[in-house]
Structure formats: structure tokens, C-alpha cells
Amino acid sequence: MHRKIASWGLGLVALAVCGADWLQFRGTNGASAAQDAAPPDSWDGETDFAWRADLPGKSVASPIVVKGRVIVTSSSGVNQDRLHVLAYDVETGKQIWSRQFWATGRTLTHPFSAVAAPTPTSDGNRIFAFSSSNDL
């Protein structure tokens, strides 16, 4: 099952404009604020996006932005035992790379959640993606 990622929130749109990294859940220092951002006054989720991408499986994790790349995670398979980490160009939405791993722990989740629930994080050089199956 593919999920369309049309918008990851006004903060991510603002980040694409100002070019800043967003390395963790809720951004720098967990403040949920982008410095010098100018988000739009109105938002139409059907047409107001720069690009969209198909993800393998499903995800409820927030994306992060590292060096011009949007990093997102997802999980797929009947038991959500296939874990994915994907990178897209922040400007064009073109997929740059993807990695797949097999879950080694328990993959049971609520029907509205996903094994790829935790938001990835970065130190600016490396990506750390944790899953609810306790895989890092």
C-alpha cells in the first residue's frame, strides 16, 4: 500500500524556503519553530505543495531535513516487518536514496499507526531511524 505524502506541514514548507536543516522531531531544540520563516496565510492540502512522493507502506513519523534532503521512514509488508528509510531532494522531491531493513522485533501496532512511528533524527552527518520493533 502506498501513501501519498503531499504535505509535511507548514514548518517544512518554510524550511525549504529558508534552507535550514530540521534534524529532529519538532526541529531545533524541540521548539517547533523555523527561524525567519514566512508560512503562507492559507493552506489547501490538495494543491498547495511543491511535490509529493509515494512511500512504500505506511508511516506516521515526521520527516526531517538534512543538507537539502527530506528524510522519511515507513514500514511495509503484511506484518509491517519491512522497514524503510528514504531520502528526497527538498527542492524537487526526486528520490535520492532508499534503504530497506527487516524488523527483528515485535511489529504489532494499532491499525492507525505504523512500525515506522518514531521520527528519525540526525547529527547533521548521520541518520538515526528507530522503529517500534526496537530496531535502530
Please report, for each region that a protein language model flagged, where it lies by residue.
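Bacterial N-terminal signal peptides
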Residues: S7-A16
